[in-house]
Curated annotation (Swiss-Prot):
GO molecular function: 4 iron, 4 sulfur cluster binding; metal ion binding; quinolinate synthetase A activity
Entry's cofactor comment: Binds 1 [4Fe-4S] cluster per subunit.
Amino-acid positions noted as binding [4Fe-4S] cluster in the UniProt annotation, renumbered to this chain: C125, C212, C309
Catalysed reactions, semicolon-separated: iminosuccinate + dihydroxyacetone phosphate = quinolinate + phosphate + 2 H2O + H(+)
Assigned GO CC terms: cytosol
Chain's gene name: nadA
Source taxon at top rank: Bacteria
Cofactor (UniProt): [4Fe-4S] cluster
Keywords per UniProt: 4Fe-4S, Cytoplasm, Iron, Iron-sulfur, Metal-binding, Pyridine nucleotide biosynthesis, Transferase
Transmembrane domains' residue ranges: none
One biological process term in Gene Ontology: 'de novo' NAD biosynthetic process from L-aspartate
Protein's cellular compartments: Cytoplasm
Source organism: Burkholderia pseudomallei (strain 1106a)
Protein name: Quinolinate synthase
Amino acid sequence: MQSAIKSVEYDRPLAAGAACGVGEAWAKVPDALAPDERDALKARIKALLVREKAVLVAHYYVDADLQALADETGGCVADSLEMARFGRDHDAHTLVVAGVRFMGETAKILSPGKRVLMPDLDATCSLDLGCLVDEFSQFCDAHPERTVVVYANTSAAVKARADWMVTSSIGLEIVADLHARGEKIIWAPDRHLGGYIQKKTGADMLMWQGSCLVHDEFKGIELDLLRREYPDAKILVHPESPEGVVALADVVGSTTQLIDAAVKLDAQRFIVATDLGILHKMRLAAPGKTFIEAPTAGNSATCKSCAHCPWMAMNALSNLADVLERGHNEIFVEAAIAQRARMPIDRMLDFAARHKQRVQASGDLQRDQALFANVGAA
């Protein structure tokens, strides 16, 4: 399969609190497949998963064909943390992670004895690219009195530099707990999610200035215009979005919680401000309801991501089949880094086990709003 190369610009912070520069990366864009090619690859992948004693673990943002394959073969389609938990607890010898690189690394850290493969090792994340370990470590060293809290969307090396790793599902609770104990915090890398948590908790947080290139593109002014066009629609927003977008939301939540909201709430129409890959699962979970993509650019403007992560798009049927056939693209994490990175991950998991209860929505938006204030994993 031939792949086009797409240039991708992303926020490139040099230090927390500093103005962002612009970084440039690239992503491969797989060619579209004919229906018979798709069907043949799906059948081949199913056979290879059995042969390799492997399980497919896919993120909500990857191609719908990969999500369907994971569901059909006893795998998992989930947010980043549940992907890692599922892989850790599954008895398969090989985990095939369809997502971006930090997800594969986290799976390997939690399952060091398993083989972890990815369709494309170059599938990365703007948050990861925008928070390099050497620069981040220098900033942390300049503020040794602060507790370092990093989001899941970071490299294993950055996690190894942290005191806590959080997903958005538990980030509010952990930061609130640290704040109640009088701790001051360094937060990285997503400035929008960090600002949302800071506003909710009142914590003293120094922010790294990274952003998700998909969510950073959503526009509050255009979203408000779309809301006026569809006044009956409820607005579902991921908290990596800018503050002006979050302010318009009926529900702020993770991928999992936004899907839950689409199912539980009485509305028949939703405007969705997150990666459009989620629409596959939303339509399956809430058939008959209408989902409208939130705008990612203003009048006459050109979107960069157009609401779909270019690196998530690198996961394709063809390279999934190839990695299972050849056994390449294996994820390795240096032992010392993995050992250090496991500590902040385990702290989060232990905290979650002690405190977290599954969010259940009743369908009453006024009653459920407090539930959705505690957002879920990316």
